[in-house]
Regions:
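Short amphipathic alpha-helical segments
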Residues: 13-37
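Short, structured motif recognition centered on aromatic/hydrophobic residues
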Residues: 1-6, 17, 28-29, 48-52
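Glycine-rich beta-strand-turn "strand-cap" elements at beta-sheet edges
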Residues: 32-49, 55, 72-99
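Short, flexible helix/strand-to-coil boundary loops that buttress conserved ligand/catalytic motifs
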Residues: 21, 64, 77
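Short, charge-rich amphipathic segments
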Residues: 1-2, 53-56, 60, 90
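Short amphipathic alpha-helices within nucleic acid-binding modules
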Residues: 15-17, 56-68
Length: 99
């Protein structure tokens, strides 16, 4: 199961956010067995979209709890919240397209 996360980043903070994501958030996720499989920044430079992967939907609560208790997450402190104005999270399941 994949989870697509779309964040509206505060004005003028995208470069700082991308750096924080690449050096702190992504490694902290991957250290807990939550791979980040894709990232994008929209053309207006105010939205950051990323996808993280779980074995299945049942895996999400335990993995998220372990992540929030990890040293990697704790070391981020308030930095993520200082960058994010709005957050939207969608759970995605791979399916077959109808003919």
């Amino acid at each position: 199961m994949d989870q697509m996360r779309s964040y509206t980043i505060n004005k003028g903070m995208m470069d700082s956010w991308v750096n924080l994501f690449e050096t702190g958030i992504k490694p902290a996720h991957e250290a807990m067995g939550i791979p980040v499989v894709a990232t994008w920044v929209n053309a207006d430079h105010n939205q950051f979209i990323w996808v993280r992967r779980f074995a299945d939907g049942d895996d999400v609560p335990a993995k998220e709890a372990a992540f929030r208790e990890s040293d990697g997450f704790k070391s981020l402190g308030s930095q993520p919240g200082e960058h994010i104005a709005k957050m939207d999270i969608q759970s995605l399941e791979q399916g077959k397209l109808a003919a």
